[in-house]
Amino acid sequence: MRLLPLLRTVLWAALLGSRLPGCSSLRHPIYWNSSNPRLLRGDAVVELGFNDYLDIFCPHYESPGPPEGPETFALYMVDWSGYEACTAEGANAFQRWNCSMPFAPFSPVRFSEKIQRYTPFPLGFEFLPGETYYYISVPTPESPGRCLRLQVSVCCKESGSSHESAHPVGSPGESGTSGWRGGHAPSPLCLLLLLLLPILRLLRVL
C-alpha cells in the first residue's frame, strides 16, 4: 500500500525531529556555592524523574578570585543522619565528586548525575522510585565555604503512599540557583505515536 511508506516516514520524522516532551529527559542545573541560601539552610529539595539529569556546577572565579579565597569542597552522598549533622563520617557516606578547580578555563566544572534504576557504569549510582537521596558538601581546610545540603526526591511513590510537596531549588531573584519538579506527563505527540504504531502493524499485515 502506498500509505504505508508515507506513514512510516511521518513517524520517523516525528521521532527524529522532535525532543518529544514528556518522552525525553530534562536537565536540572544547581549552582553549588554558599551564595545559595537554600543550600545553606538545608531545605533545598528537587524532584526528578527517571532519565532526568542533576547538573552540579562547581564555584567558578576569574583570577585572582575573591579576597577570602575560592570555595573548594568535596560532595558526598549520605544518609539522613549524615544530612542532618552535615557530616560525611557515617558508614553509608561516600564521596561523589570533588570541586577543586575554581579557576577552570572557560566555564565552571560540571558534574552530572543521571537518575536511572540501573547503570552500566561502575561509578554510576542506581536510584529507586519514591526514595529521597541526600547530598552534602564538606569544605576543604583552606576553603572559606560552609556546609551545603541538597535533597533529591525521585519520582514516583507507590500508589496509595502519602506524598509531601517538595520545594523547588531556586526561584526568580534567588542567587545562583534554579530547579524544577519532576514527574512529567506524556506529551500529545508521544501519545499519538503510540496510537499509530498498532495501525502501522495492521497495514503491514494487509
Swiss-Prot record:
Source organism of the structure: Mus musculus (Mouse)
Name of the featured protein: Ephrin-A4
Tissue expression profile of the protein: Expressed in myogenic progenitor cells.
GO cellular component: plasma membrane; side of membrane
Disordered, as annotated region: 161-180
Gene name tied to this protein: Efna4
Gene Ontology biological process: ephrin receptor signaling pathway
Predominant location category: membrane
Positions of GPI-anchor amidated serine lipidation: 175
Molecular-function GO terms, alphabetical: ephrin receptor binding
Signal peptide (from-to): 1-25
Similarity section: Belongs to the ephrin family.
Sequence motif: Cell attachment site, positions: 41-43
Disulfide pattern: 58-99, 86-147
Subcellular locations according to the entry: Cell membrane
Keywords: Cell membrane, Disulfide bond, Glycoprotein, GPI-anchor, Lipoprotein, Membrane, Signal
